[in-house]
Amino acid sequence: MTTLIPEVVSGIHFHYMGKTGTVGLWYKGLQVPRLSFVDGSRQFFRVGSYFIKAEYVFEGYSGQCANEIYIQNRIRPQDKKYFTKLLACSDIVSEGIQWTMFPWYNLRPTSCDSKIFAVCYKQVISLCERYQIYDVEYAFNTNWYIHNGRPLIVDCGIGGQSE
């Protein structure tokens, strides 16, 4: 299936939670229905007249740290060819942070502190840049870190929930 790229991208939100790796996609505050599911590793979503391919790997644990990815505001014209890779940063985040560096499933929510976050953030930046994904902004609980601008926010939530 061809992945079409919308001219304007705003508020796309991936939310991962639970042992089953449940995935949801939100666009402008509305949940977008998944179109198909292939081999447990690929989803296609419709946003307006566009089809968006989202690939992900996730082994989250309910009640512990959950991963969220937001794509905010805009994508620079020169980065549009990386749009599907930007969406696939969910792969990158879970590959990099999850959970080879830290045994998140052994952490209590109160243990998700800034020291752990700092290493987490460095790894996310490294992985996203490896895949030529730019403008990364990482949010961890109440701490916000900005890297080269702002369309991508990666947020470690607590308890598998997000606001």
Segment roles from a protein language model:
Residues 24-25, 42-47, 86-91, 144:
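Short, exposed beta-strand/loop patches in secreted or surface proteins that constitute
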Residues 134-163:
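Catalytic activation segment of kinase domains across protein kinase-like and atypical kinase folds
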Residues 1-33:
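Juxta-kinase regulatory segment immediately upstream of eukaryotic protein kinase catalytic domains
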Residues 45-49, 104, 147:
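Active-site beta-strand termini and strand-to-loop segments that position acidic
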